[in-house]
Amino acid sequence: MLSNKRISLIKVLPIPSNKKNVFKINCSSNTTIITTSSTTTTSGIKSYSTHNRSNNDTHTSKSNTIDQHQQQQPQQHQNNDNKHLFTPTPFQSLVKNVNKPFRNDKDPDYLPTHHSVLNMSLDQLIEMYKNRKVVDLSHVPTLDPQDVFINSELKLEEIDVFGFDYDYTLANYGDQVQHLIYDLAMSHLVDEQKYPMALKEIKYDPTFAIRGLHFDVNHGLLMKLDYLNNIQAGAIYHGRRPLTKEEVIQIYGSMQLKRLYCDSFLKPMSDIFCLPEACLIANTIQYLTDHNLAFEPRIIHEDVTAAVGKVHLGGGLHNKIISDFPLYLNKHPLLGEFLLKLKSHGKKLFLLTNNSYFYANHGMKYLLNDQLNGKYEDWTDVFDVIITKCDKPSFFGKGRPFRMYHPDSDRYDWNEVNHFEPKKVYVGGSLKQFTNVSKWRGRSVMYFGDHLYSDLVEPSQKEGWKTGVIIKELEVEVGIQNSPKYREQLAELLQLEDVIRKCQFFSGEKKELFLEQLKTERYKKRLALKEPFNANFGSLFRTHTNATIFASSLQRHADIYTSKIENLISYPLTASLIPSRNYLPHEFKLN
């Protein structure tokens, strides 16, 4: 029996079958040698005998075992009886059973303590890399871009109440809205805040930014971070100029930012409405830099944010959209069918939006009224509670008292709201008051929105609501991942990274040259995988290796996510949505 002391690491050295099978096990405080004969019982199980050696014998036994193993190594490759010990399979995993122990120049008896080593020479590794074959991925299924993706198990039959935001949830805007926001905010910046008139000549670039970025108000840098606050190399900009890795390290001292610094100076840009804001900040900084005009980054951020806020609150944006719905709103024929399906199964529906009733009413009539199939006269008949001007995220905190609003007279009641009436409109309110008045509580309520922090975090944490996020970009991202070219490039990158891991176990000039070649190739392949999503910042959901802050927050705060709300229509309302197993780095991945 092995020592009952905790074994911190086990290494097994198989010895050819023409000798006694000897397996050397390195333990944290002693060394155990297991010797086995080739005798097999009638049940087919080999019998083992073991004995312990004291720590005084450890060095001797290590040397003898390694030397004996090296002398017999050529025979092992020729002996079919030992095929079960190791069958080399390129690119499958880093750790293999040991056939040739690692040698350290300073200590020839040194055996690495972190994991087993390779059974091949450097020349064999180089040859294997040169002769690598394109991985056949034709049997690997693609993902449905319009599927519902699950973070946490969700039983739809337990949901009695479904709530919805308006912007980018029920209302799916076209790309022209981003151009409109940028132009209106730029006009405010120049006309009201007296920024240089020449800025108006710089137009919105829809290809520049992605959402989920962060702006450093201390240094004036727009960047993409992973969930560990690592800056993605090549995805950090001063104005429209990307910074090199050396420049980033000169500024921050590292590619990883401290949590305290992030909390103090980084401003998140988490929803689609932030895209024109990010572009406007970058264009403004670039213009001021090019013309040698001194500026404070924090002030630029405050002015641009204020200008974008004025666009949303001033009425100009909404009036423009209402004047041309076909240009700015994308109608989806399944939206009405999905909402009617919920109603037919006895579900309660509510609308919770920051927009005015005037704006939401015009949009909902355009989107829904021709999809009600004669079952309802107006979209307001479909929703049990309608709340506008709720002022999220303040709504989820202290909030304000609810007030009933009368659209016909543009008048607000002064009375306390102690129950919700059908076809009536309410403004203001708070999450606590909403729960008390509606009596809808906890996990029987599910709310859908497009903004993780403004829409979903607090209702989930404070009231236990189930949450769903609508991410418009998801269909494009999944479509790119499904493309044969992307999948082939990803497979090549994973192969390459496996070779890099193996190469690092060797030493010498030849190894260094080969490793440098591999790293250069890795850099090129990473760029090739980044550019299809966005040439500047890459994917919304991941950096080269890790999940982005956006994706990590999505996993923590959303039970499900999808590209549009009506994607749920194909799921029975009795379905249990079960997530895929989330593997940890040390776990075996079974596909």
From Swiss-Prot:
Gene3D superfamilies: HAD superfamily/HAD-like
Low complexity bias locations: 38-50, 68-78
Names of the cofactor(s): Mg(2+)
Alphabetized SUPFAM superfamilies for the sequence: HAD-like
Binding site for substrate: T305, A306, A307, V308, G309, K310, V311, H312, L313
Protein residues bound to Mg(2+): D165, D167, D450
Coiled coil: none
Key words of the record: Hydrolase, Magnesium, Metal-binding
EC number: 3.1.3.-
Top-level division of the source organism's lineage: Eukaryota
NCBIfam families reported in the protein's UniProt record: HAD-IG-Ncltidse
Protein name: 5'-nucleotidase domain-containing protein DDB_G0275467
Organism the protein comes from: Dictyostelium discoideum
